[in-house]
Design a protein with these regions (language model features):
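Catalytic machinery of carbohydrate-active enzymes
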Residues: 1-350
């Protein structure tokens, strides 16, 4: 138990966007418990925009700076560090910097050498969601560590940057609308499809995205296809098939603007990627496509938010463990299931 309130706390999570999003509730809980404590969040430069969208984080700390410079948290020497993602080099660096309280887990041998507060926590064998596991680590700070998924989904409060007017105009575009003015509706549901995952997870077949696009009524839906510039070539078969029905926004926006675009849209469909978790955290309709196999199942990685849903087969076959690209569990998720959910959501707008 803490003897005094810390001046500041560093949350260390230096992996991908989705992992970072699922760690942001830790900042919210720390701020609720210690309102006067400055919260620093350490990550990689490419996740900076999503970290800075969190109102409970006072400052972003680049892990490269942390490893090579004497960093501060809002001008103060670091007081506490939470190793949410265990990284040996970061743990040893935190000890070398003399951070007074260094919190890690008992199942990392190097944490016994580098941390002075240890939490009994094994992610590998846990039945908990990743966000619930993240909230277990601050236990030595004397705060509540058990949260339901519904409670966690209410903790985000993300504040996106203003959306560039040029991108905002896309959400009102009449492109791909019926030629007959009598059929045009200005209140179409703005849907983002994010087919790829930069190789970070199982993906729904591109053919299923194509089928879904053909199933949706353009009188009711305005469809955008997103992805990184590097993923554009891999998406070409989709654009060849249904490019006349969608707006291609791949590689058009930096992360800050993409977050703002998701916030301004109505819904997003993706596998367990960063954009899916961003959409859920923003309170948008977030439709996640998952395989039922551990450790990538929705029990661990489902998007959290008031309007998040997951689509997953009940039974796992495990045939794709050696060939994730040929995942029959993902292929078994029917486009018609997504169509039904999207039409139900759109009926609340149109």
């Amino acid at each position: 138990m803490l003897k005094q309130v810390p001046d500041n706390i560093i949350i260390s999570r230096t992996d991908s966007i989705g992992d970072v999003v699922l760690t942001l509730p830790v900042a919210a809980v720390l701020k609720q418990h210690f309102p006067g404590t400055k919260i620093g969040f350490m990550g990689r430069s490419y996740t900076r925009a999503v970290i800075e969208a969190c109102p409970y984080v006072d400052t972003f700390i680049d892990v490269t700076d942390f490893m090579h410079e004497a960093v501060t948290v809002c001008g103060e020497k670091p007081a506490v560090i939470l190793h949410e993602l265990p990284v040996p080099a970061i743990a040893y660096r935190a000890k070398k910097l003399g951070i007074p309280q260094r919190i890690g887990t008992t199942n990392r041998s190097y944490h016994w050498l580098t941390c002075n507060r240890l939490v009994r926590l094994s992610r590998k064998n846990s039945q908990l969601h990743e966000a619930q596991l993240n909230l277990r680590l601050p236990e030595p700070l004397g705060i509540r560590t058990e949260w339901s998924l519904a409670e966690i989904g209410q903790l985000y409060g993300l504040k996106p940057a203003p959306l560039d007017p040029a991108f905002a105009a896309l959400l009102q575009s009449e492109e791909h609308h019926p030629a007959n003015p009598a059929l045009r509706r200005p209140d179409r549901y703005n849907l983002i499809l994010h087919p790829k995952s930069q190789g970070h997870g199982r993906e729904w077949p591109l053919e299923h995205f194509i089928h879904l696009i053909r199933l949706l009524d353009l009188q009711r839906f305005r469809i955008f296809v997103s992805g990184t510039a590097k993923e554009r070539d891999r998406l070409q078969p989709l654009f060849d098939a249904v490019g006349s029905l969608v707006t291609d926004i791949t590689g058009m926006m930096d992360l800050a603007q993409f977050i703002a675009f998701i916030h301004a849209a109505d819904g997003l469909v993706a596998s367990g990627t960063g954009p899916l978790h961003i959409a859920a955290a923003l309170g948008k309709d977030a439709y996640g496509l998952f395989p039922p196999i551990r450790p990538v199942h929705p029990g661990r990685w489902a998007p959290l938010g008031p309007r998040a849903q997951v689509f997953v087969l009940k039974d796992a076959c495990n045939d794709c463990r050696k060939d994730p690209a040929g995942c029959s569990c993902m292929a078994g998720i029917e486009p018609l299931w997504l169509k039904a959910a999207l039409e139900k959501a759109a009926s609340g707008i149109i």
